Regions:
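A short catalytic or substrate-binding loop motif that flags glycine-/basic-rich loops and adjacent residues
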Residues: 56-60
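Metallo-beta-lactamase
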Residues: 1-54, 101-116
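Glycine-rich, charged/polar anion/phosphate-binding loops
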Residues: 51, 61-62
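Cap/insert and terminal regions of metallo-dependent hydrolase folds
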Residues: 62-66, 70-152
Length: 152
């Protein structure tokens, strides 16, 4: 991702508008302060039960997070899967870096999750419909992903 946000990709407006200049500058600052690490493998196990998987597609460095919870493995897909419909139909989100990797990322996300009921999309409103908040105070903000979703 760093190659993308500091390189020729940013000469294309559709890519550039997705990033804030100050955020890119902050990442470069962190790099110079030796406070930034890069994942260089396709799969990065950062702690027991926590794995990052590089899938690419939407962006050059798109990753998903696989976490072992009380109910087993789940995948936090972030922008790799904006909406569940994308996985179900293999119809991509409108902005992507690499179409083939985006479709493959849908398949990888679903396979690593073990089913749609263990895949958490990045932007689908169904997520807040299917999972309760951890408390009333956090309704619609912090969800309990340890339980099975209430899919209608």
């Amino acid at each position: 991702e760093m190659n993308s946000i500091t390189g020729p990709d940013m000469t294309y407006t559709p890519f550039r508008v997705a990033y804030h200049k100050r955020d890119t500058q902050k990442l470069v600052d962190l790099l110079y302060e030796e406070r930034l690490s890069f994942f260089t493998e396709t799969v990065n196990k950062v702690a027991p039960g926590i794995e990052f998987h590089l899938v690419g597609g939407h962006s050059r460095g798109q990753m998903i997070l696989r976490i072992h919870t009380k109910r087993g493995w789940i995948v936090l897909a972030s922008d790799a899967v904006h909406l569940y419909e994308e996985v179900e139909t293999e119809r991509p989100f409108s902005i992507f870096h690499d179409l083939q990797k985006m479709i493959a990322g849908y398949r990888t996300s679903l396979q690593l999750a073990g089913g749609i009921n263990r895949l958490i999309s990045g932007h689908d409103p169904k997520v807040t419909d299917w999972y309760p908040a951890i408390s009333n105070e956090f309704e619609g903000q912090l969800l309990d992903l340890n339980i099975h979703p209430q899919m209608n």
